[in-house]
Amino acid sequence: MPNVVLSSRLTNNDSVFLQEWIKPSVRPYYLKNEKTKFWPEQRELVTDLLEHDIIESAFQTALNPAPQRFVRIVKFHRVNDYTVYATIRDSTALILCYFTVDCVLDYETINNDRITLNTLNTLFVIGNVTLQFWNHRECKLWFNQDFPGLRMVPVLKIEKARMFDRDQISSNVQFEWVYDTLHG
């Protein structure tokens, strides 16, 4: 009898909910803006989360998953006035982001924990995400990162975040920055 390999086993995902969405979402806006040399923010790159009870919301998301909503926090770069600057990833790519003051306060009130406490590699559901384009000086200041091949650096502004799975599963896979794939 021949071996059967399920399509879900062809890629090494650490969660069935964590799918590729960063590259396909960010790249078209970057390429369009690079041509026009105008860098407006893109609102609702990811739509808002439902305003239900946390358990109900997580359960609802599990039943009807939208792949663009799941991320893992890979690194915290800095915290300044309750704004948290971090690197997140989907199943294939890394991107810089920041969690707004309202997002952090909402998370910490609901979970009675700091957003930076034991959340590295934790699976989050995010919502109300805006794609912004930052200059190199801002990225160096807030993230201590530089991407010299880019004119502007895409950064995600996250206004809603809910912990979906508290397991801190790290991956042996080396993820690439979304910035390495943005050149035409």
UniProtKB/Swiss-Prot annotation:
Main location: nucleus
Annotated S-S bridges: none
CC annotations in GO: chromosome, telomeric region; telomerase holoenzyme complex
Keywords carried by this UniProt record: Chromosome, Nucleus, Telomere
GO MF annotations in UniProt: telomeric DNA binding
Superkingdom to which the source organism belongs: Eukaryota
Compartments in which it is found: Nucleus; Chromosome, Telomere
GO biological process: telomere maintenance via telomerase
Keyword Nucleus: yes
Subunit structure: Component of the telomerase complex.
Biological role: Component of the telomerase complex involved in telomere replication. Stimulates RNA/DNA heteroduplex unwinding which favors the telomere replication by the telomerase.
Family: Belongs to the EST3 family.
Name by which UniProt lists this protein: Telomere replication protein EST3
Biological source species: Kluyveromyces lactis (strain ATCC 8585 / CBS 2359 / DSM 70799 / NBRC 1267 / NRRL Y-1140 / WM37) (Yeast)
Biological classification of the source: Eukaryota, Fungi, Dikarya, Ascomycota, Saccharomycotina
